[in-house]
């Protein structure tokens, strides 16, 4: 068996790749590894709104109970809520059943340790090796030593109270549009903003099990961009299916992506003396415009590989407070141990309220360089073809010479799907489009030859 865990837990098409059998095994092995030596350990279990969530939850919980651990089921909540509530409830671990921004047929299983952090590779490998070794040495308790399933009704309220505590102002006088992606934030985000006094209008908050992320949310913000202008809102916020990411829309209907959000929040934290070492952790995918804007503000950046886990590792290592990705995974380490869409949205809204500036005015400190991202479909075992194939390497070198220091080429494999992402940055959008599509086509043809 290849490595089960990708960049963000175990992902796959539910019922064919991520089967009930595999969910049971992950529950059993995960509970064993994460709670060794604990008497009657407690594991928190939450999920997003996908139809396959019920099937996978039943199997996962069965696995947890089979090693004598208790499963505390909190139902549909955002991924960051599990990270927070695992700490608050003093659970021994947390598990989320979600495939985040992926289409409905996918699902995933992601573990958090008792401190609310995603697992390190070594722990994931231990879980996998227990499954591969047929649960050798894993107990099968009987009678009173089996685990119980406990349903927890207070999770949403507890998470909303936590989210509200991350800002010091009320939001009265602001009109805010929310796009909940028919996902896990459909209750929490609406309740939080309303309780803080904002006038809230909402789209895509009617999940039916199959409409999660469908032409909505942070992966498809076009509807929200129109809606903000039509409704005369001060800003809009788009979450993804499990609400660990958030993108914003300004009052003119312009998209404010994660790079803009980090620039706005980074400057605000620095002005308040709250940005440790005036440092923000970003990834190699962040726009060059972000670095230029931060240079003007005397803010430094550290660049990591793509993936919020790598951003988080760097932040934890040196205690940095702000980090994130262009996609809207923003981590405010003072508040939560993972990307948190609701906390991110609240920081943006509070800065608009505190400064009295419009979001478009706040965003004007950064000018985005044209950036083109094209997916090339390649088999999983060919994701490194751009490094191995001499013709592709030569083509990339030519493109970089052409961009002449005012842009760059970045090719990176997806951690969750059979594709590589071809990213070009430079000054001329039209030219970049042509070059990126031609390069993606070349990679696709060679990888599938």
Curated annotation (Swiss-Prot):
Catalytic reaction list: alpha-D-glucosamine 1-phosphate = D-glucosamine 6-phosphate
Bilayer-spanning residue ranges: none
Enzyme Commission number(s) from the entry: 5.4.2.10
Pfam family for this entry, one: PGM_PMM_II
Modification comment: Activated by phosphorylation.
Top-level taxon of the source organism: Bacteria
UniProt cofactor note: Binds 1 Mg(2+) ion per subunit.
Keyword terms of this UniProt record: Isomerase, Magnesium, Metal-binding, Phosphoprotein
EC class: isomerase
MF term (GO), any: phosphoglucosamine mutase activity
InterPro entries (alphabetical): A-D-PHexomutase_a/b/a-I (IPR005844), A-D-PHexomutase_a/b/a-I/II/III (IPR016055), A-D-PHexomutase_a/b/a-II (IPR005845), A-D-PHexomutase_a/b/a-III (IPR005846), A-D-PHexomutase_C (IPR005843), A-D-PHexomutase_C_sf (IPR036900), A-D-PHexomutase_CS (IPR016066), Alpha-D-phosphohexomutase_SF (IPR005841)
PROSITE patterns the record matches: PGM_PMM (PS00710)
Positions with a binding annotation for Mg(2+): 100, 240, 242, 244
Active site per database record: 100
Gene3D superfamilies: Alpha-D-Glucose-1,6-Bisphosphate, subunit A, domain 3 (3.40.120.10), Alpha-D-phosphohexomutase, C-terminal domain (3.30.310.50)
Cofactor(s) needed by this chain: Mg(2+)
BP terms from Gene Ontology: carbohydrate metabolic process; peptidoglycan biosynthetic process; UDP-N-acetylglucosamine biosynthetic process
Entry's Gene Ontology cellular component terms: cytosol
Keyword DNA repair: no
Modified residue annotations for Phosphoserine: 100
NCBIfam families: glmM, PRK10887.1
Family to which this protein belongs: Belongs to the phosphohexose mutase family.
Physiological role: Catalyzes the conversion of glucosamine-6-phosphate to glucosamine-1-phosphate.
The protein's name: Phosphoglucosamine mutase
Protein source organism: Clostridium novyi (strain NT)
């Amino acid at each position: 068996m290849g490595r089960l865990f990708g960049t963000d837990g175990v992902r796959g098409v539910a019922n064919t790749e991520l089967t009930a059998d595999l969910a049971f095994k992950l529950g059993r092995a995960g509970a064993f590894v994460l709670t060794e030596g604990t008497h009657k350990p407690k594991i928190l279990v939450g999920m997003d709104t996908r139809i396959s969530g019920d099937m996978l939850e039943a199997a996962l919980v069965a696995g947890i109970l089979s090693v004598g651990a208790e499963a505390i089921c909190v139902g549909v909540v955002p991924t960051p809520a599990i990270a927070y509530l695992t700490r608050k409830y003093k659970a021994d671990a947390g598990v989320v059943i979600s495939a985040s921004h992926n289409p409905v047929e996918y699902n995933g299983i992601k573990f958090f340790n008792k401190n609310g952090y995603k697992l390190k590779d070594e722990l994931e490998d231990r879980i996998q090796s227990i499954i591969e070794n047929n649960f050798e040495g894993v107990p099968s308790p009987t009678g009173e030593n089996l685990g119980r399933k406990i349903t927890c009704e207070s999770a949403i309220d507890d998470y909303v109270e936590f989210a509200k505590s991350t800002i010091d102002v009320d939001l009265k006088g602001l009109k805010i549009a929310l796009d909940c992606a028919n996902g896990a934030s459909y209750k929490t985000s609406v309740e939080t903003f309303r309780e803080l006094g904002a006038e809230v209008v909402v789209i895509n908050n009617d999940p039916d099990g199959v409409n999660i992320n469908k032409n909505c949310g942070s992966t498809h913000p076009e509807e929200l961009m129109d809606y903000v202008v039509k409704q005369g809102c001060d800003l809009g916020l788009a979450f993804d299916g499990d609400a660990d990411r958030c993108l914003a829309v300004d009052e003119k209907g312009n998209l404010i992506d994660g790079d803009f959000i980090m620039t706005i929040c980074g400057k605000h934290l620095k002005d308040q003396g709250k940005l440790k070492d005036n440092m923000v952790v970003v990834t190699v995918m962040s726009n060059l415009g972000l670095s230029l804007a931060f240079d003007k503000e005397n803010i430094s950046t550290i660049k990591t590989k793509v993936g919020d886990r790598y951003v988080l590792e760097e932040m934890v290592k040196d205690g940095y407070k702000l980090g994130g990705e262009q996609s809207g995974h923003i981590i405010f380490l003072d508040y939560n141990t993972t990307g948190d869409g609701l906390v991110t949205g609240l920081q943006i809204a509070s800065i608009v309220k505190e400064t009295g500036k419009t979001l478009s005015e706040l965003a004007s400190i950064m000018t985005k360089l044209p950036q083109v991202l094209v997916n090339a479909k390649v088999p999983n075992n060919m994701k490194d073809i751009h490094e191995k194939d001499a013709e592709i390497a030569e083509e990339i070198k030519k493109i970089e010479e052409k961009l002449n220091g005012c842009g760059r080429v970045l090719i990176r494999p997806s951690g969750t799907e059979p594709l590589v992402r071809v990213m070009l940055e430079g000054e001329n959008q039209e030219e970049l489009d042509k070059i990126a599509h031609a390069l993606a086509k070349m990679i696709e043809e060679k990888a599938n030859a």
